[in-house]
Amino acid sequence: MIKIYDTMSRDLREFVPIEDGKIKMYVCGPTVYNYIHVGNARSTVAFDTIRRYFEYRGYKVAYISNFTDVDDKIINRAREEGITPQEVADKYIAAFREDVTALGVKPATRHPRVVEFMADIIRFVEDLIEKGFAYESQGDVYFRVEKSHNYAKLANKTLEDLELGASGRTDEETARKENPVDFALWKSSKPGEISWDSPWGPGRPGWHIECSVMSTEILGDTIDIHGGGADLEFPHHTNEIAQSEAKTGKAFANYWMHNGFVNIDNVKMSKSLGNFITVHDALKTLDGQVLRFFFATQHYRKPINFTEKAVRDAETNLKYLKNTYEQPFTGNVDAQELQNFKDKFVAAMDEDFNAANGITVVFEMAKWINSGNYDASVKQALADMLEIFGIVFVEEVLDAEIEDLIQKRQEARANRDFATADQIRDQLVTQGIKLLDTKDGVRWTRD
C-alpha cells in the first residue's frame, strides 16, 4: 500500500487513484529563460523517481510536465541576448532536454508549452469573469481572492494574514485591484512586448493560469497528483487551486506533493541569491548518474546540502554498486532471501517514496550478493531497483587483449607460476583493471 505525504492535509495518506491502475500526474516544469540549476534538477529527478516507482508497482502513468515559455523573465532575456522570446524558449528547452537526459530522466508523456494553449487560456479567464470570480481593470484581469473558499489552505495561510501583509502596498498595479491580494490572470502588454489579442486588449497570461489550463485541458478537471518544488506551495499552487476549483467546482488534485530544496552551505540554492550551480556546468566534471544518485541519498521532501564530499561519496558508492552488478554469477541463491529483499525495498518505497531507505536496502542486497549470492534473477532484481532511481549500468566489454591477459594469468596460477601471475596483475592495474580472486573464480573491476 503506497502512502503519500499530502501537503494539503499535512499527513501521510493512503494512495487511492481516481481510476484503478492509472495515474494522472502534473508536475510544474521550468520557466525556460536560462539553464536549470541543481536545485531545479532535484524536482525533475524526484518526480521522475516517483513516476518510475508507480510504474514499477504496475501503474500506467500519464505524466505531464510543462514548459513555461511565456514569462517576463523570458522577455527580459530576449532583450539581453538580442533575440526573440520564442528563440530564448527554444534554446533553453533544448538545453533542459540535454541536461535531464544526462540525469537519466524519462521524457514526460507530454511536455506542453504555454503558447499552444493561448485560446484555451482566454476561454478559461472568460469563464471566471462570467462566474464572478474575476474582473477586468485597465486591460488586466484579476482573480477575486475573497470569493475563493478557504483560499491558501494549501500553504496553511488565511486570507486575513495575506490582506494584512498586503495592506501597505501602494504601487500602480495594486491601485488597479479591488483587493491587494488579488492576482493576475491576464496582463496587458507594454509597447513592443510579445502579446496575444484578447477581449481585454493585447496581453499575455499570468503565470498561475498557465498551469491550470494545461493540466485541465490534457488530464481533466481533477487529477491524482500535482507536484513541484516547496517554493511553489504559495503563491503558484495556491492560485492554481483557487482559479481551477472556481471554474470547475471540483477538487483540482487529490494529492499535493512538494520536494525540498537543494542548499549550498545550508542556504537554499537559487538564481536570485546567486549561489547556484547549473546542471550544464556540473556535468562538465560530474557524471549525470552520480548527481542523480546524490539526490537519492535523501528523502525527496527534506532539504539536501550540496557539497563536494557528498557528491564524491555518491560517486564512490555508485562505483561499488556497478562493480557488484558486473561481477560473474556464483549460483547458490536462496530464492526466499531474494524475495525478502524485494519486499523490504517495496516497504521502504511505499512509505512516501523514501529513496534513502530504498537505497539502504539496495546496499544490503549488494553485500549479500558479494558474499556469494548472484545469478540472473538477482541481477534482474538489482537492475529493476536501480532503474527506479534512473541508474542503468551499461556493462563494459573488455578488450580482447585484456581478456587474453586475464586468461594467461589464470593459467599461470594453475601452473603455480605466481611470479608471472603477479606480473600480469600489475600490468592490468596500470590499465585500470583490478582483479579479485574468489572461491568462485576471478572478478575484475574498473578502477
Curated annotation (Swiss-Prot):
Motif ('KMSKS' region): 268-272
Chain positions recorded as ATP binding sites: 271
CDD domains assigned to the protein according to its UniProt record, in alphabetical order: CysRS_core (cd00672)
Superkingdom of the organism of origin: Bacteria
UniProt-listed Enzyme Commission number(s): 6.1.1.16
UniProt catalytic activity: tRNA(Cys) + L-cysteine + ATP = L-cysteinyl-tRNA(Cys) + AMP + diphosphate
Keyword Zinc appears in the UniProt entry: yes
Cross-referenced Gene3D superfamilies: Anticodon-binding domain of a subclass of class I aminoacyl-tRNA synthetases (1.20.120.640), HUPs (3.40.50.620)
Annotated Zn(2+) binding sites: 28, 211, 236, 240
Motif ('HIGH' region): 30-40
Record's keyword terms, sorted: Aminoacyl-tRNA synthetase, ATP-binding, Cytoplasm, Ligase, Metal-binding, Nucleotide-binding, Protein biosynthesis, Zinc
InterPro entries, A to Z: Cys-tRNA-ligase, Cys-tRNA-synt_Ia_DALR, Cys-tRNA/MSH_ligase, CysS_C, Rossmann-like_a/b/a_fold, tRNA-synt_1_cat_dom, tRNAsynth_Ia_anticodon-bd
Cofactor: Zn(2+)
Gene Ontology biological-process entries: cysteinyl-tRNA aminoacylation
Pfam family of the protein (one): DALR_2
Main location: cytoplasm
GO molecular function, one term: cysteine-tRNA ligase activity
Subcellular location: Cytoplasm
GO cellular component: cytosol
Cofactor, free-text remark: Binds 1 zinc ion per subunit.
Enzyme class: ligase
Xref: NCBIfam families: cysS
Subunit structure: Monomer.
HAMAP family (alphabetical): Cys_tRNA_synth (MF_00041)
UniProt family annotation: Belongs to the class-I aminoacyl-tRNA synthetase family.
Protein name: Cysteine--tRNA ligase
Protein species of origin: Streptococcus pneumoniae serotype 4 (strain ATCC BAA-334 / TIGR4)
